[in-house]
Amino acid sequence: MDILKSEILRKRQLVEDRNLLVENKKYFKRSELAKKEEEAYFERCGYRIQPKEEDQKPLTSSNPVLELELAEEKLPMTLSRQEVIRRLRERGEPIRLFGETDYDAFQRLRKIEILTPEVNKGLRNDLKAALDKIDQQYLNEIVGGQEPGEEDTQNDLKVHEENTTIEELEALGESLGKGDDHKDMDIITKFLKFLLGVWAKELNAREDYVKRSVQGKLNSATQKQTESYLRPLFRKLRKRNLPADIKESITDIIKFMLQREYVKANDAYLQMAIGNAPWPIGVTMVGIHARTGREKIFSKHVAHVLNDETQRKYIQGLKRLMTICQKHFPTDPSKCVEYNAL
């Protein structure tokens, strides 16, 4: 017991000798103690530690004016602690640093909001973001100016030039679903990019006043949004890692679209997106015997639109391209689906 007491006293005396405790604080950083012990060791060995440039120069912010303003105006806390925590979490910042008081956290939040007002935008509306991009393009055109007689093409949508025609694609569609997965993925990619190009050319051919109208901006934003939704699908097709069940369903959809069997294509789309069996709820495996709901869990009965957000987006983008395909390449009314979306 005496040995333990003497060790505690030795540790306490060591902390007091190193001057680690400030008057108003009851704790110290272990790194400071290690640094002091290292300095004492070098002094005993006869070495002299040269102070680093970082230690000589005071820490300055990238915005000294802001630091001066925050230091001079010590405003009282105008936000509750709960609101400060919420705003810090929205920006991905820690709610409290080591040794930080509530007021210090409030001051840190003020500094973050002034320097980086929108660091993390969080979950944003994709269509709203596309509309903002369209508005910014028009604003840049107004600010930059335009020479008289110059053709206004800088705000046109990007067109995917596939150097192919619908007749060539229809001929390629005859070989879909014959067992060559790599060829099927190439045809799917080519046809979807062809439809995106057809859609972009149609929107670019509009009059300028139509492009600048609210509905015109909405149509342009929808096309941009659809293109961004389909990028993960194009990436999977290019890397040949598209899941087999989704690949089979998309192959059927594209084949029916090339045959202009839009009702059958819509049925295949619903089969992929929604499925025809509910997902069993509750325990499906008890003991050695599976319950009846277990046998319904396989790819054809699963709603892929519910799997994750990425799949939901490119399935939605595929549905929009089905509408565009029927609009530009019509067939008999009995083989068409009534669309009011676009």
Curated annotation (Swiss-Prot):
UniProt entry keywords in alphabetical sequence: Acetylation, mRNA processing, mRNA splicing, Nucleus, Spliceosome
InterPro entries per record: Prp18, PRP4-like, PRP4-like_sf, PRPF18
UniProt modified residues of type N-acetylmethionine: M1
Main location: nucleus
Superkingdom assignment: Eukaryota
One GO location term (cellular component): U2-type post-spliceosomal complex
Tagged with keyword Signal: no
Gene3D superfamilies tied to this protein: Functional domain of the splicing factor Prp18, Pre-mRNA processing factor 4 domain
Compartment(s) where it occurs, according to its Swiss-Prot or TrEMBL record: Nucleus speckle
GO biological process: generation of catalytic spliceosome for second transesterification step
Function: Participates in the second step of pre-mRNA splicing.
Subunit: Heterodimer with PPIH. Interacts with PRPF4 and with the spliceosome. Part of a complex containing U4/U6 snRNPs.
Family membership: Belongs to the PRP18 family.
Identification of the protein by name: Pre-mRNA-splicing factor 18
Lineage of source species: Eukaryota, Metazoa, Chordata, Craniata, Vertebrata
Gene name as annotated: PRPF18
